C-alpha cells in the first residue's frame, strides 16, 4: 500500500522542489524537511525556507525551530525523523522527505553511521587548534589525514571538520573508514529525484539570488550581525550567509563581490549535489514541471 511507504524527493538547489509541493494533497501527506540550514530560526531568506502559503497548504516538519547558535547534526536529524515518521503514519498519511542535504538522505537510506565516541580532552585539543591556528589549518590537517572526507565536506562546515579530526585524533583511523552502519529504520522507500539541465539550473540560481535581494536579504544579514551572530554561529555556514562574513574580514568587498561569490558557490554546490545524487541507486528521475503528473500518480 502507498500509505505504508516513505517517499524521498531530492534534487539540487533551485531545481524546483518546493513548487511541486503545492500540488500535493494535504490530507494524504506531510513534509519532513531535509535541509541543514532551514532548521534555524531567523535565517530565512537565503535558506529559501518554504513560504507561509506553502506551509499553510501542507504541513512541514523540521523548519524554523532551532536557535542559530545550536549545532544541528545528522544524529539529531535522524532521531527526529524517526519520531516524526511514526506520528505521520498514525494519521494514515505518507511521510515525504524533501530537501537537498545529500548527506542526510544517504543515511536515511543506508542507516546511521557508527563512529566512536570522542573524549572531552580531544574535543578541547581540536577547539584550541581552531582558536590558535584557524579554520585553514584544520582543513589542511584534514586533507592530510583523510582526503576522502576532505573532498566530501562543505569547507565552511566547521562542525564536521572538527568532528572528522576528533575521530582521527582519538582512533588514528580516518572517519571515512568507519563504514559500519546499522540497518536503516526506514523501509519501503520510494525515491524521486528532480533534475534539470545544468544551464537551466544556473539561470534559476541567478534569478533566485535576485529574488532574495528584493525580498530583503541585506536587511536580514544586518539584523543578524546586530544580534551578535558571527562566524562561530552554525547557521552562518550556509551559502548566502557565509559569504557576508567577508564584510568583516575584507571590508573592501562590495555588495556585487558578495553576490557574485554567492552565485559561484551556489552553482558549485548544485554541481556537487547532482554528482552525489546521481550515484544513489534506485532513484526515479523526473523533470519537476514536465513530469509533474507522473510524479503525483506515482506517489499518490
Swiss-Prot record:
EC numbers for this chain: 2.5.1.75
Site residues (Interaction with substrate tRNA), renumbered to this chain: 101, 123
Catalyzed reactions: adenosine(37) in tRNA + dimethylallyl diphosphate = N(6)-dimethylallyladenosine(37) in tRNA + diphosphate
Keyword line: ATP-binding, Magnesium, Nucleotide-binding, Transferase, tRNA processing
One example GO MF annotation: ATP binding
Entry's family note: Belongs to the IPP transferase family.
Residue segments, region Interaction with substrate tRNA: 35-38
Cofactor(s) the protein needs: Mg(2+)
Residues reported in the UniProt entry to bind substrate: 13-18
Membrane-spanning segments: none
Record gene name: miaA
Assembly description: Monomer.
The protein, known as: tRNA dimethylallyltransferase
Species, as recorded: Borreliella afzelii (strain PKo)
Pfam families the UniProt entry points to: IPPT
Keyword Nucleotide-binding set for record: yes
